[in-house]
Amino acid sequence: MKLEKSVTNTIKEYINKEKTTTNYYILYHSTDSDFFNVIQYDNAKKGDRYFNPLGNGLYFSTNKQFSKTFGKNTYYYLLPKTSKIKKITYKSWTESSYQNILKLVLKKYNIDYWKDTTHTQKVELMRLANNTPISSLNELQELLSSPDLGYNLPNVQETIESVVDKINAKYDAVWYKDTDYYQKADEILIPTLSFKKELFIKELPK
């Protein structure tokens, strides 16, 4: 993968000199795959495609050691600091982000939250806002496909993904801060349509 000289120099500054006053955030993605096909980067594991409740794309972290827990091979992504970045904290997820996703998902099924759900269902749906983002949406798909509501599970998963993907498409990156993991590591999603292959590179030799 050929990079512009200025971009290559920036990567070298980060890796070899640990400089932080540049125009990019350096993000890390680790995998056990010896060959990483960026054309199919939204297929995060071999075999059948699986549910991505936080949206399709490639996930990174600014915490290299945390990233390495997911695989032996580490890749870099340079995210320009001028990018349009959506930052989600546990507080903002609980107070607004989850409710927005829930509203749009229910609308897809023509469910009126106030008229078409029981008191118990209302309590369950809103309780999920207090979980971590990935847990909230995993439990939402289980609730919608439960016998009480009875929607088809694969369809529910596709619906949640499509809603989240549409929200994420407005941004170059979605940055989850303090929403999960005991190490307080962040997680950054580069959405499918925002991913720039020229900024994705295998780790350079030390």
Task: Please give the residue ranges for each predicted region.
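GIY-YIG-like beta-to-alpha core
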Residues: L58-F66
